């Protein structure tokens, strides 16, 4: 069974209830056969190990390149330290295929083989940009992948491994321009709790704007952003106080009184 159909304990940090390909808590990736006490996320039964053939990306060939690239890239220190930790422990060739059932793109010419989602997902950056160029005549002639173009990614800390190791290696392998920098941020929590539909802490942006001005939320998030990967907590009591004191209060204080108006 592909990784997302398996759950268990992370073999790296011991976090429970993690998927079979990566850990949300420590960010590590691993083979689904490495996860501790695995169960099927569909049936809850214990999976049986069977042999199957896969395609691999020879990531080990890029180990020296990745070390040098990280050294010369101004990635946040906490992320860079974690990436170097992964590199120093020895990276393995990357399994880029999954067997059916899977939700990725089917590999042409193969029987029930799919590209692993983190192999094809970053390619979407290239495909989306190419599509944008096709419908916008003003930028159609620009080569966005030459060495003079700067490329920046803004991502969540849970996908740093894929964007800071796999993605640069892919770009290097096809001789495309590398990211100028990658900025990672933490998760968004609600009143100190992880977003969850079952716990009623999941908020859609479309629902939020029905009650509040989106500019208030942008300001609140901007006031909490930093160069770290700490989670940002949307605490509604703090949100109310901050908006009232910083924005609404300031507006009222600086507004002219009736006698001052012309």
Regions found by a protein language model. Name each.
Residues 256-262:
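A short, hydrophobic C-terminal helix/tail in secreted or cell-surface proteins
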Residues 17, 30, 47:
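Cys/His-rich microdomains that often coordinate metals
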Residues 3-4, 9-13, 22, 36-255:
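Structured secondary-structure scaffolds
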Residues 31, 103-104, 262:
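Short amphipathic alpha-helical segments with coiled-coil-like heptad repeat character
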Residues 27:
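Acyl-donor-binding surface of acyltransferase catalytic domains
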